[in-house]
Amino acid sequence: GDNVFTEFKGAFTEQYVLQQLLALGLKPYYWSNTKTPSEIDFIIQDSQRVIPVEVKAEENVRAKSLAQFIKDNPGLKGLRISMKGYVDQEWMENIPLIAIGTYFER
């Protein structure tokens, strides 16, 4: 049934985003803090910027680790990829899953 999808929805969504990033020629990295349980799903570096990326499989998009990472690294702007529409906040942008290619090709 749907139990497998429900249980692994986050992992499937992260895998989809990873495949999209690789298809765009980007080289994503993973980051975790050894002192706390925080993690950033992907760190992308292109010619102009470093982008910490948090992937959310649902519309419940609290991104505490991303917020803390941005707080600890002033000057960076985070990217959250989720099922929600586009939102631009001072510290982070949210883009829908279907807009990954468009976002990085600009």
What are these regions (language model features)?
Residues G1-R106:
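A cross-kingdom feature that marks ATP-driven nucleic-acid transaction machinery
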